[in-house]
From Swiss-Prot:
Residues that, per the record, bind Mg(2+): S545
Gene name tied to this protein: TAP1
Name under which the protein is recorded: Antigen peptide transporter 1
Reactions catalysed according to its record: a peptide antigen(in) + ATP + H2O = a peptide antigen(out) + ADP + phosphate + H(+)
Family to which this protein belongs: Belongs to the ABC transporter superfamily. ABCB family. MHC peptide exporter (TC 3.A.1.209) subfamily.
Function: ABC transporter associated with antigen processing. In complex with TAP2 mediates unidirectional translocation of peptide antigens from cytosol to endoplasmic reticulum (ER) for loading onto MHC class I (MHCI) molecules. Uses the chemical energy of ATP to export peptides against the concentration gradient. During the transport cycle alternates between 'inward-facing' state with peptide binding site facing the cytosol to 'outward-facing' state with peptide binding site facing the ER lumen.
Length: 748
């Protein structure tokens, strides 16, 4: 297939993908500053009347958004599909579109906000006129100051919504929200409580500012008492709302966990038989239980904190803008310095820590090597050489320790100095605003307290976000099971009132999916008739159990057809089919529940105690069950280890007989039964009046059962070598006769 890249013309040097991305972004921002800043206001000054400044700034902003969005699409299109050379650029390129939106909407949104808060105030129009005109350089810089943090937040939150990778499970957040189901209302109520609690929490800074003004103005005692009372009421209400919100959220996450775990387990149960052979039971259970529990715990703790601080930060940002746009812009501009610089220095410090540990390990290795080989060191008189080598390693550690100390000091310094510079900047600008009368001293105190809470909220969000992203990413493993399409055919619709039990294998071939080139069965053609017992015998590995598995619809033939009363087996409804076709294996599964429930396992209608007892009597299980202290109510452990092999087989046979199947499969199901129980099974197969209402496929080691069969098939190498009654096959003196003469090689 031809490459999708066109060859570059001779003499032309193509830019790497990352360089192209940087160049396109720089040109886009340069065009925004040089062209859009001056051109768009001039164009709309001709189109929009001067009397409508707010409409004009919105027209400029939306047009700017459209142009920048088209440019961002062009840059993305030029770099999409490139290989690993610009894999690193793809991360920040994804923020171009939200940056375009933020740049276009920053000034219009700010202008609208200023208009709303200054509604009806004298001189308010003049105070916002510069903001209305986007060509002013200061306003344009303000748009970038507001847009960069907004775009970063938008991009970070948007990365939680990205679809899964190849073969993934789609959008993980949408899938998790889909698991809420009826709990969506509760989550909505939780978000409302978060908003109300966050607003109530802001009462302390607000009333602290008002009390500051009261102190400076020497206000009345009633004003002080009223403000203090309101602050106390709002603070208590905020705490109560937070408590209720946490309770609702944790309860909702508990419901989501139960629902999700049930859905995953149900999806696993719908998979084909090969799925359970290719995946270990422990791995499957890890997905069903541990992965869902880990996801639920992570979402309950981390997502709750993330939502609280996200809403709190947004509320604080809105109130800060309400209080002072200029001080808020100073806060937003310094946020990258406040968090990114300490983060970079912290990485340098962590790298030095790793190097120190590695150097310590190397020095220890030198000492261990010398001490463990002292005879060799002494025989070569190299004691001083080993000591010198150890001193060199210690010198390396000393140098690294000095660098680590410097890095620690720089890390601590950058964290404290960046926070201090922000406070100094706010106090300096705020002091000028107080001096000019633009804000009161109390308002400045309130803003400083809000700014401290806002900075703390951003810091918490930056620390929690990776954990939330990891939790959302881990949900993709769970959704792999939910989205996996079973390879077995869907359940059919046939549920006839009467089924004779005529089974026809028509040229059936089969190979297991994990070894498709190895045919286990080759062109099998035979019939199981109602009222007859067909015995299937042959050496180990000849495919007898595979025939039983095909008849249970656990696998699908790779060739030929398997018919039940003339209809393909998959056309029957799943539950109906397994009521009519019952099987008992050599090592049947007994579940961790009562013996009564084990016998009635899988029945949609609960059988009576008489029916359960009758089935147990026929299988030989009643004799030992009745001797137990609690009888049929005796609880069995998870693996049924308290029962012997014969007792488990008897219980499993009763579980099959209670269904009154028209097709009964006994796959070495009597190998562990005692003599009395085997005699009961023999009478059940050949003397019971019910034998005429069912077809029986018998696979057994006991020749006494085989000899009485109506038809015997000898299977070898996946093909039927001979068939007939016991007498006919013995007269032929073929494969069956040889097997009978050699008991050690008797069939399974």
């Amino acid at each position: 297939m031809a490459s999708s890249r066109c060859p570059a013309p001779r003499g032309c040097r193509c830019l790497p993908g990352a360089s192209l991305a940087w160049l396109g972004t720089v040109l886009l921002l340069l065009a925004d500053w040089v062209l859009l800043r001056t051109a768009l206001p001039r164009i709309f000054s001709l189109l929009v009347p001067t009397a409508l400044p707010l409409l004009r700034v919105w027209a400029v902003g939306l047009s700017r958004w459209a142009v920048l969005w088209l440019g961002a699409c062009g840059v993305l299109r030029a770099t999409v599909g490139s290989k690993s050379e610009n894999a690193g650029a793809q991360g920040w390129l994804a923020a171009l579109k939200p940056l375009a939106a933020a740049l276009g909407l920053a000034l219009p949104g700010l202008a609208l906000f200023r208009e709303l808060i200054s509604w009806g105030a004298p001189g308010s129009a003049d105070s916002t006129r510069l903001l209305h005109w986007g060509s002013h350089p200061t306003a344009f810089v303000v748009s970038y100051a507001a847009a960069l943090p907004a775009a970063a937040l938008w991009h970070k939150l948007g990365s939680l919504w990205v679809p899964g990778g190849q073969g993934g499970s789609g959008n993980p957040v949408r899938r998790l929200l889909g698991c809420l189901g009826s709990e969506t209302r509760r989550l909505s109520l939780f978000l409302v409580l978060v908003v109300l609690s966050s607003l109530g929490e802001m009462a302390i800074p607000f009333f602290t500012g008002r009390l500051t003004d009261w102190i400076l103005q020497d206000g009345s005692a009633d004003t002080f008492t009223r403000n203090l009372t309101l602050m106390s009421i709002l603070t208590i209400a905020s705490a109560v709302l937070e408590f209720v919100g946490d309770g609702i959220y944790n309860n909702t996450m508990g419901h989501v966990h139960s629902h999700l775990q049930g859905e995953v387990f149900g999806a696993v149960l719908r998979q084909e038989t090969e799925f359970f052979q290719q995946n270990q039971t422990g791995n499957i259970m890890s997905r069903v239980t541990e992965d869902t529990s880990t996801l639920s715990d992570s979402l309950s703790e981390n997502l709750s904190l993330f939502l609280w601080y996200l809403v709190r930060g947004l509320c604080l940002l809105g109130i800060m803008l309400w209080g002072s746009v200029s001080l808020t812009m100073v806060t937003l501009i310094t946020l990258p310095l406040l968090f990114l610089l300490p983060k970079k220095v912290g990485k340098w410090y962590q790298l030095l820590e790793v190097q120190v540990r590695e150097s310590l390990a190397k020095s220890s290795q030198v000492a261990i090597e010398a001490l463990s080989a002292m005879p060799t060191v002494r025989s070569f008189a190299n004691e001083e050489g080993e000591a010198q080598k150890f001193r060199e390693k210690l010198q390396e550690i000393k140098t690294l320790n000095q660098k680590e100390a410097v890095a620690y000091a720089v890390n601590s310094w950058t964290t404290s100095i960046s926070g201090m510079l922000l406070k100094v900047g706010i106090l300096y600008i705020g002091g000028q605003l107080v001096t000019s009368g633009a804000v009161s001293s109390g308002n400045l105190v309130t803003f400083v307290l809000y700014q401290m809470q806002f900075t703390q909220a951003v810091e918490v969000l930056l620390s929690i976000y990776p954990r939330v992203q990891k939790a959302v990413g881990s949900s993709e493993k769970i959704f792999e099971y939910l989205d996996r399409t079973p390879r077995c055919p869907p359940s059919g619709l046939l549920t006839p009132l009467h089924l004779e039990g005529l089974v026809q294998f028509q040229d059936v071939s089969f190979a297991y999916p994990n070894r498709p080139d190895v045919l286990v069965l080759q062109g099998l053609t035979f019939t199981l008739r109602p009222g007859e017992v067909t015995a299937l015998v042959g050496p180990n590995g000849s495919g007898k159990s595979t025939v039983a598995a095909l008849l249970q619809n656990l696998y699908q033939p790779t060739g030929g057809q398997l018919l039940l009363d003339g209809k393909p087996l998959p056309q029957y409804e799943h539950r109906y089919l397994h009521r009519q076709v019952a099987a008992v294996g050599q090592e049947p599964q007994v579940f961790g529940r009562s013996l009564q429930e084990n016998i009635a396992y899988g029945l949609t209608q609960k059988p009576t105690m008489e029916e359960i007892t009758a089935a147990a009597v026929k299988s030989g299980a009643h004799s030992f069950i009745s001797g137990l202290p609690q009888g049929y109510d005796t609880e069995v452990d998870e693996a049924g280890s308290q029962l012997s092999g014969g007792q488990r087989q008897a219980v499993a046979l009763a579980r099959a007989l209670i269904r009154k199947p028209c097709v009964l499969i006994l796959d070495d199901a009597t190998s562990a039964l005692d003599a009395n129980s085997q005699l009961q099974v023999e009478q059940l197969l050949y003397e019971s009046p019910e034998r005429y209402s069912r077809s029986v496929l018998l696979i057994t080691q006991h020749l006494s059962l085989v000899e009485q069969a109506d038809h015997i098939l000898f299977l070898e190498g996946g093909a039927i070598r001979e068939g007939g009654t016991h007498q006919q096959l013995m007269e032929k003196k073929g494969c069956y006769w040889a097997m009978v003469q050699a008991p050690a090689d008797a069939p399974e």
